[in-house]
Amino acid sequence: MVLSNPAMLPPGFRFHPTDEELIVHYLRNRAASSPCPVSIIADVDIYKFDPWDLPSKENYGDREWYFFSPRDRKYPNGIRPNRAAGSGYWKATGTDKPIHSSGGAATNESVGVKKALVFYKGRPPKGTKTNWIMHEYRLAAADAHAANTYRPMKFRNTSMRLDDWVLCRIYKKSSHASPLAVPPLSDHEQDEPCALEENAPLYAPSSSSAASMILQGAAAGAFPSLHAAAAATQRTAMQKIPSISDLLNEYSLSQLFDDGGAAAAAPLQEMARQPDHHHHQQQQHALFGHPVMNHFIANNSMVQLAHLDPSSSAAASTSAGAVVEPPAVTGKRKRSSDGGEPTIQALPPAAAAAKKPNGSCVGATFQIGSALQGSSLGLSHQMLLHSNMGMN
């Protein structure tokens, strides 16, 4: 059944032939001037038009269009086809694909060749690539030689004609490519959270790492404030560095040196006057548990006991099991006005403490003022009483 009029096509007709069907049932018939099964492929020299002008010249087609077209030589004595068309040119991509017959193993022969081309606007080699694609089908060598026995008069040109007929399928590739999926910012920040957690490992960040942490937190929108970040970073760094405060549970050693010990004297005296004996022992154990603090209290309390009450100093030294020599009288030699023997003028305890030479590292370091001396005197009495109770 041959339909010469495309308007006579039955309802629901769709033209989607395979490569083999295009060559065997359409191109071969057109080259032999035989009627095609359906006359829906027009004879158009596609190299005289731009591809976007061809849909208006076809007989049938919606998204792809089929044409029978001749091919001319690029050079008179060459075999290369002329690919110039309209305002641009067609450029071949890839290699030729042979089309084989599916009639069985005995008849599995090559019936044609398929070539893919892309249209470029402009002149080679600086053309602009477009989305117009063409699949060109041509007959195999034996069929092409047999088809050349008859040539239509309007396309007959023995000098430049390469092929009388080739079948071209032209379509436009969709330019709406799916955009690449960009991951959200939170996915990048999950590996390096900027918020400080209570159970997070402690570390001392450098200035560069702290700055990067602040920037990451600000980008993620999870950073509360710069002040809180600076405080958290400083607190984390202080927890990492060991200090003397680790030696004392309740009172930091730095408090003993601030403002001459006045700030530390009040809590020390309050602890010395604590009526609860059990609670008082726990506080003193936390304060005097370290040998450095015991050495400091012993040096300062023995000196003050010697100045205030020699009997108390002797009793304290006896109970502690150590012999403490009475300190030398500290003062200045002053000659009397009558020419008699020089006399020694005693200095106040604070002046004597200030004049104390740096003979002992501990004694020279822990001179913290009269307020601390008074508190250390009371604490030394408590320590001596507890030591006597332990010995009894």
Swiss-Prot record:
**Classification via Pfam families:** NAM (PF02365)
Q: What does this protein do?
A: Transcription factor that acts as a positive regulator of the jasmonate (JA) pathway to mediate leaf senescence. May directly regulate LOX2, AOC, AOS2, AOC1 and OPR7, which are genes involved in the biosynthesis of JA. Regulates positively leaf senescence by directly targeting senescence-associated genes (SAGs) related to chlorophyll degradation, nutrient transport and other genes associated with abscisic acid-induced leaf senescence. Transcription activator that plays a role in mediating abiotic stress responses through the abscisic acid (ABA) pathway.
Q: Which residues form a coiled coil?
A: none
Q: Where is this region: Disordered?
A: 317-345
Q: Where is the NAC domain?
A: 9-173
Q: Which gene encodes it?
A: NAC58
Keyword Aminoacyl-tRNA synthetase found: no
Q: Which domain of life is it from?
A: Eukaryota
**Per the entry's comment, what about the domains?**
The NAC domain includes a DNA binding domain and a dimerization domain.
The protein's location, in the record's own words, is:
Nucleus
Concerning what turns on (or off) its expression, the entry says: Up-regulated during leaf senescence. Induced by treatment with methyl jasmonate (MeJa). Induced by salt stress, cold stress, osmotic stress and treatment with hydrogen peroxide. Induced by treatment with abscisic acid (ABA).
Q: What is this protein called?
A: NAC domain-containing protein 58
The alphabetized UniProt keywords are: Abscisic acid signaling pathway, DNA-binding, Jasmonic acid signaling pathway, Nucleus, Transcription, Transcription regulation
Found, by tissue, as follows: Expressed in leaves, nodes, internodes and mature seeds. Highly expressed in roots. Expressed in leaf sheaths, flag leaves and inflorescences. Expressed in primary and lateral roots, particularly in the vascular tissues. Expressed in the primary phloem of the culm and leaf sheaths. Expressed principally in the primary phloem and in the peripheral zone of the leaf vascular bundles. Expressed in the floral tissues.
**Gene Ontology cellular component list:** nucleus
Additional note from the record: Plants overexpressing NAC58 display an accelerated leaf senescence phenotype at the grain-filling stage. The gain-of-function mutant plants ps1-D (T-DNA activation tagging) exhibit premature leaf senescence phenotype. Plants silencing NAC58 exhibit delayed leaf senescence and an extended grain-filling period, resulting in significant increase in the grain yield. Plants overexpressing NAC58 exhibit a significantly reduced rate of water loss, enhanced tolerance to high salinity, drought and low temperature at the vegetative stage, and improved yield under drought stress at the flowering stage.
SUPFAM superfamilies of this UniProt entry?
NAC domain
GO BP: abscisic acid-activated signaling pathway; regulation of DNA-templated transcription
GO MF entries: DNA binding
Gene3D superfamilies named in the record: NAC domain (2.170.150.80)
